[in-house]
Amino acid sequence: MTEDQLLGPRAHGEPCGSAVLKAVAEDFQVEEVLDIPLSGEGEHLWLWVEKRNLNTEEAAKRIARAAGVPLKLISYAGLKDRQALTRQWFSLHLPGKADPDLAAAEDDSLRLLQRVRHQRKLQRGAHSANGFRLRLTDLHADHAQLDARLERIRAQGVPNYFGLQRFGYEGGNLLGARDFAARAELPVQRNLRSRLLSAGRSYLFNRVLAQRVADGSWAEARVGDLLAFTDSRSFFPAAEAECSDPRLAILDLHPTGPLWGEGGSPAGAEIQALEDAVAASEEPIANWLAQAGMKHERRILRLPIGGLSWHYPGPDILQLEFVLPTGCFATAMVRELVSLAGQTDI
């Protein structure tokens, strides 16, 4: 499946040119932002870990083996890209135990940068944001055009699409979700079940967002929209007055789209009709998500790009730095700048 099929139209026009991302791991750096003061004591050992071309789950397995503890005692806030240089926290539950020797977990792909004790384990979703440093190489684009596009993105944000990674190689996760949905069955294996449910849910969201981008309403509130702040999971309905709320203009408040589940869309009539039509077009997946017990949630349609800065280390290199809310994809911003020719797994 193509990028346009899995995501949708761009909001800021055609790409300014082409580039390569992730020529090496250091070209895609991600650092977790965690606003939790660690006490220095307690039965949980927190580890600040740097990973190179290593996914989060494999890192957790390595740490568990080196520590001699079951994998279930290892916690992390979120999954990070494999093809990247990433820094994130892990925690180990070690009641009544001394700090283990973790040297066996380390090599060129995993380094332990810091160890701190704390009273509580690291919860999923506990981080407040992710910081990114991206290096686009083999750049074929006019710098002035890129600068203008980046200024526009800084002022207006980008559509908050789920990225290609969510759907697997050539959309394999979505194809798997459709297969199980057609049979009204769920995968027995927990990780596979989670991955396929996530792909199906993300695809329905992207289809709604694609329609809002196509009609120009992805960044504006309509009567009946459900609005949410950037870092909040709660939402409230938009009446006429809320549609002109000044917080929409400064990218603090946003319209939302559906993360499908039981109960259908709680939006107002016009928005609900759009969202229900998308669900009806993928009825087996929508029903399957409800069958699996997924609860209906919301996700902001517009992605604000925090702290965006950029420079050109060379004529064919663009370096970007920015911060995104958790669960959002850096490639949603990159695709509004350049096309990543031939890179289908970014």
Swiss-Prot record:
SUPFAM superfamilies: Pseudouridine synthase. Keywords: Isomerase, tRNA processing. It comes from the Bacteria. HAMAP family: TruD. Belongs to the pseudouridine synthase TruD family. One of its GO terms (biological process) is tRNA pseudouridine synthesis. One of its GO terms (cellular component) is cytosol. GO terms for molecular function: RNA binding; tRNA pseudouridine(13) synthase activity. It catalyses: uridine(13) in tRNA = pseudouridine(13) in tRNA. Residues 157-303 form the TRUD domain. Gene3D superfamilies: TruD, catalytic domain, TruD, insertion domain. The keyword GTP-binding does not apply. The keyword Transmembrane helix does not apply. This is tRNA pseudouridine synthase D. Its EC number is 5.4.99.27.
